[in-house]
Amino acid sequence: MAPNRERIAEDDLNLPYFHGALMNQDADQLLVNEGDFMVTSRTVAELNKLQFHLAVRLKKGIRRYEIKRNATSAKLGTRSAGNIGKLIDSLKAETIEIKGEKVTLKRAIAKGKFQLMHRDVNFKKQIGSGAYGTVYKGRLAKNNAVIAVKKLDTEGTDEEGLADMMKEARVMQLYDHPNIVKFYGFILDDFPYLLVLEFCNGGAVEDLLREKPDLKVNRRVQYTYMASAGMDYLHKKNCIHRDIAARNCLIHNGVVKMADFGMCRATAVYKVDLSKPLNVRWLAPEVWNNGETRFNTDVYAFGVMIWEFFITPYQSPYHEWKGYTVKQKVRAGYRMPPPDGMPREMVIVLNECWNHDPNKRPTAEKLKEKLEELNQKFEAGDASVLQGPEKSSDPPTNN
């Protein structure tokens, strides 16, 4: 924790309408009717100080008024009280004028089901790191469920870090599926800011593939099918994942779950900045033309992940090339040869995912159906699916 970090008083934390560092765009979605209100906080990094605001919807839009807070009082305009709760109670008693506008506080907006508090979680053991912070293993206080906690390491001084964290929170709270990592909520009432997720006891698929090069083909097929079910669910929810890879699939009790939604967008088309770092090895060739990512660019990335699931021993895609070379080769039509031991039917699926024409790639739904059928054949012991790919010096077709 940063030295001399100002803490939020317990009586302020306990206010049902105190939403902590909830970002304005999220708060605005909750302030629906005239008179709806909440209290939020933010850190002024250069002063290392907390600021509190009363956010309220008026006829002309949402207003935010700073509440002056110290150890013994809270003040807004000419009104003051011993703390924020008492101040709000006095403001609710009548219509008041603030900065020349009539303000009536009608309905206090309470925290939603995904807005947890620090007292709701316990965590100590660090298990990894993510794009914007450290990941810990912990438990939910209410039911002792094992959780993974992503901690924003910048302690509220980095607005961009908080924005990235909340992008992930916004999309994850929309989804509930066995092959998607479960989202429990976010914590913004005080520092540190946290995301709370299901803990997956099997770790990342990539790590498993590295540790177990002798993993049986039927298990690899099963993992591929389960991942496709997760992608199909996301696409039906109008969401592009944009970061599909073996490292972003986790395993819990043998079930593969798609994870890491930091790049996920709830839209059918999302334009990326081609000047910024990209996951070149998983990127569909057409993205380099206009920067547009779509459902079929996810499918292309899924094809690369299929290759990851079957290469033995595990290695990164195009591991012998630098990113620039990968970009050139893939745009020119090159695709990696299928790994030895990959079932013929899986090779067909792989090539379909890698079709140079994005419109000829299978949808996530069709992909899931094909992989479900293949998985069922393996479960039934169908000998015909055990044959590996035919040897060929040619790359997969781009027809």
Regions found by a protein language model. Give the residues of each.
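Catalytic-loop of the protein kinase fold
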Residues: 235-251
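A short, aromatic-enriched beta-strand patch in the conserved N-lobe beta-sheet
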Residues: 185-186
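Activation segment signature within eukaryotic-like protein kinase domains
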Residues: 223-224
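Conserved short submotifs of the Hanks-type protein kinase catalytic core
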Residues: 190-204, 208
